[in-house]
Amino acid sequence: MGFTGAEVLLAAAFFLVGVAKGSAMNACTILVSDNSADRTRGMNLMHSCYACGALLCPFLIAAAARVSTSLAVFLLAALGVVLWLVYWKTPMEGKVKDRKAAIDWSFLRSGRFWLLTGLLFCQNAAEQSVTGWMVTYFKGSGIIAGTLAAYTVTVMWGATLVARLLIAFVFPFKSPRKAMVVMAVTCTLFYMLLMRADSQPAAILLLFAFAFAMAGMNPTAVASAGRMTSVTSMSIMLPAASSGAILMPWVIGRVAERAGLAAGMAMNIVPCVGLIIFSVLVERLSEQEYERS
């Protein structure tokens, strides 16, 4: 892409980045789960690193693009090489080597597995809908104008990074299941208030609060899989959950075409409410069911 500028290579690059991201998240989830005494802290720390990269990389690439578009593309390629080198040097043994070679499909019979998958589906749907549509919504409604509108995603990633670091190091969850219920309720409340925001300061503040409230949901839910965390289970849970990030933005777009963007964004309350339902169901599992599933 850097040498030719061919658009077909750009499309191929997006596809390969998607494959690489999914594979990296799957592999890192297994490694962190197998090598962390506290899975919730480990997952939040891992996702903090992800948020840090998502927050800083756009500024780095934008700076390179001011020099040359090709430089920005080559820089992305260089970062990909660095990622490959990191995996090459990362010790992969740990506890994984002690596991049996036979694939264990028992997680498919676990109610907890499917409840957590549903929870992650709603989390991905709600988060990516805001990430994908909020700039357009703010500009279209006139709430946030100019260059500030382009930095709404930066606000979200900043809030996400702060929240995950606080969970990992300052305020660790004593009861992750109850914490997920609190996060689900608060992020739903903040989203409803965000939809009613009519000024720039209120919109930015509520967007920060929404992202902050939701930040710990994904890593905490994945960590709650406990003993079910394996290459096979994550290969089903994470892609199934990620489909929410594809489906919900499409639903919002279809509704927006017919009833306006405000109505489309209001549809995002559905996965937010889904977060509450699934988190409550996970929390209501008895300790015996939770350990057995």
Where in the sequence are the language-model features?
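Intracellular juxtamembrane helix-capping segments at the cytosolic ends
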Residues: 22-36, 214-229
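Cytoplasmic helix-loop-helix junction between adjacent transmembrane helices
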Residues: 13-48
